[in-house]
Amino acid sequence: MGGSASSQLDEGKCAYIRGKTEASIKNFSPYYSRQYSVAFCNHVRSEVEQQRDLTSQFLKTKPPLEPGTVLYEAELSQFAEDIRKWKDRYVVVKNDFAVESYENKEAYQRGAVPKSRILPAGGKVLTSEEEYSLLSDKHFPDPTASSEKNSQPFLVLPKAFPVYLWQPYLRHGYFCFHEAAEQQKFSALLNDCIRHLNHDYMKQTTFEAQAFLEAVQFFRQEKGHYGAWEVITGDEVQILSKLVMEELLPTLQTDLLPKLKGKKNDRKRAWFGLLEEAYNLVQHQVSEGLSALKEECRALTKDLEGTIRSDMDQIVNSKNFLTGKIRAMVAQPAENRCGESVQPFLASILEELMGPVSSGFSEVRALFEKEVDELSQSFHTTQDGAQLKECLDQLMKLPLDSVKMEPCYTKVTLLPERLLDLQSRFRFPHVDLVVQRTQNYMQELMENAVFTFEQLLSPYLQGEASRTAVAIEKVKLRVLKQYDYDSSTIRKKIFQEALIQITLPTVQKALASTCKPELQKYEQFIFADHTNMIHVENIYEEILYQILLDETLKVITEAAILKKHNLFEDNMALPSESVSSLTDLKTSMGSNQASPARGASAILPGAPGDEAPGSEVFQGPEEKQQQPGVPGSLAREESASISGSSPPSGEDGQVSVSGVDNSAGNPLSADNSAGPLSSHLSEAEAGEPPKDEETAHKRPESSAVPGSLRELKELLTVTVFVESAPEIGNDTLNGTPVPQEDKKEEEEEEESKIHPEASGPAAIQQDSCEESEVREREAHPMPLEAEAPGVNLGTLPEGRGPTSQSTGEGLTENTSCLGPIEEPSEAQGPTEEVLLATVSTQDSTEAGGEAVHSVTVTPQEDATLSSNPICPVENNEGPQVSEDQEVLGGNDSPALAMDTEQINDAHVYECHWEVEDAPSADILDVHDCDVGSPGEW
């Protein structure tokens, strides 16, 4: 039969293994202790500064599965090493990715201890005898194997479809199936388990995990090993155990391999058993030693926490000072080395990475769309809500369906072939780790996509079948748009990590002999109390990393600008990062794999009759309550984006509002009110006759080319129509009515002159003004309706500041009372500046600046339009007050006092108001709107 592994590993050899393990842990301890303190200090700093991850994401993140969730269970044939026979076992794989084997299904159900439990971290899955023999021979350095031919197979298979699980330092697993489909399902599942066990620990963000990985890196650099390391897979105990085994392996091969007797297959089996016994011994001792080391570090940081928190500013300043010193020494040689050995190859490496990675993510997108289309088609056929829920539950399991996801993963497996030259140029043989990490990201993105789809669709499952069918299609398009953006973000992250992982070891190794010895002299700049929190080696590595990061970001940004593989730029104008429901962001029916910014635009619903069929599925309960006519919060938000000026009388009651991009803080500054985008003139401004009510409600269709300048203009323009009757002005001297046409002529004449002087003094009683406004609102409500030509303003990015919010509240509450006008001595200076700012929209636009909000309002009923207290007033003119307001003011308080010698018959009030962004609500429905002063908005 051959030698037994247990007989070769005698007590002396076990003692030797324990001694080597203890020495390795002792050598590793200083690195871990230093990195533990540094990582803990960084953790406290991020906690104090409340640092957050700025990575944007549209899709909802799927919560983790409940512990103990079963991913796979089936009865199959497994080779039992203890009895060296094939046995039928009941195999169960849960979401801890351990492969557990039970005697039978009944034993599993009653909670029996599994016969075997395999954690296949670092393993490889093979499905043919030839592939397995090649791999196992590679890790069996038998000196006599070259002269011996192995005619017999390693195992006699009881069934036609085997699965081999190769593992480093552990016995291999062997499974058999009757059908190829079962073989494919189990092998795909094992690959999923290996990927997650290899990389899930490295994805942890705890400071202890970061400290351990940094310690392993510095520990290996002292031995001349740089960059990625194939055995950094699994958890911290597995990683450190493999570190020890890496040192033990040459000795074990020298001492034990020559003693093995028998045929090649027997010696091979004995060697693998010997390695497993040694590895288990090392792993047990490493687990104990690492636990003790952690307790020491926790006690140390507990004592340091007070110092870290109290001296945080000093620690940060000291580190920044030290960073500047070391960067001055390192920057030039690092940049030279990067320019010679790295920068010329970054673009070509990125090009080779982008193809397979992007094709894999595109395959995931296509799979999601295909599954949703099948779900939709099934619902169209059956119209059964219960069956739809079952299909939706199956869709939620799609990311865990290894067979369906495998074609997506296969697209990325082309990377090793595309990057063959990396092994010779950059000594990076571990492209398979990049492949596995990419596949994990693909599975995670699919999980988020199906979870977002289910969350957005669930409110509409109980409705009518026709509405549910429409909702399925619209939700699918929404999720696909969000997927495109998140896919671009994740792929750029993958490219960044891969480029740095590939090229950083080259720079580190090149500078190790020249720059690293110089680091010791910089330790004198560290305070004695801060030596545990600041280490020059960490700062040195951070500087090298940042230099390479800047170079990689350049090539990735260039690829995004060129739209390669549907990558999006980082500075795209996007809607909010969190989309909680269909009402948050409308998606047009014709959307496909377009930019999220383009997907954000949709049709703004106007009157209820204009709404597209099926669009009600996008309206939440709150939105539906606000639509019938109550202004509500949406109306207040809309009104915050509308600015107005006192209009010439006699024109049609139309308001033209032009959006302003990056408007300045002072809304009355002429310098900040001109822009390259010209404002759209309303029909009243163009001198055209007013249209009837039906025309006012009709939604114009945009003919602008997508992405053109005209489309941008339309995105920034909204037209508000005011329906009102002709107004008869009141002479403020004697209360006699003044014809509106005469007032218009006088106002146009005075407006052409524009006297840069302030009006005389005036005093207003607030109580009487409020009472008059209340009565005016009750008698003459003035609805405003907004239409945006071809654009959904609700999808524009929200950018309201405190000013715009207060503006919206003021307009909705109709606080349009006149405030006290300042004395001439106080108001003359600022009034002259303000008056110069009251230029027309067209003039300011032609001057070349930012686009201006121009508002023209002409009420045609007896509604009161109060002028702004800060608006410019013509010389020797006072505010215009209606007859009703004058009478009401006399009931409760003294009438409006004005100097009759300083008041003319014509009254012109020009005011220019600006808001930063176009409104983002879906409906602008402001009733009883009297244009108040900006100070009250």
From Swiss-Prot:
Region entry Disordered, spans: 584-710, 724-891
CDD domains from the UniProt entry: Niban-like (cd23949)
Spans traversing the lipid bilayer: none
Biased composition (Low complexity): 640-651
Record PTM Phosphoserine, positions in chain: 578, 581, 595, 601, 646, 708, 768
Tissues of expression: Detected in brain, lung, spleen and skeletal muscle. Expressed in small renal tumors but not in normal kidney.
Compositionally biased residues, Polar residues: 584-595, 655-681, 802-817, 855-869
Entry membrane topology: Lipid-anchor
Cellular compartments annotated: Cytoplasm; Membrane
Gene Ontology process terms (BP): negative regulation of protein phosphorylation; positive regulation of protein phosphorylation; positive regulation of translation; response to endoplasmic reticulum stress
Disulfides per UniProt: none
InterPro entries in the record: Niban-like
Lipidation (N-myristoyl glycine): 2
Bias type Basic and acidic residues, positions: 688-701
Gene Ontology cellular component list: cytoplasm; membrane
Keyword terms: Cytoplasm, Lipoprotein, Membrane, Myristate, Phosphoprotein, Stress response, Translation regulation
Its biological purpose: Regulates phosphorylation of a number of proteins involved in translation regulation including EIF2A, EIF4EBP1 and RPS6KB1. May be involved in the endoplasmic reticulum stress response.
Note: 'Niban' means 'second' in Japanese.
Entry's family note: Belongs to the Niban family.
Name assigned to this protein: Protein Niban 1
Species per Swiss-Prot/TrEMBL record: Rattus norvegicus
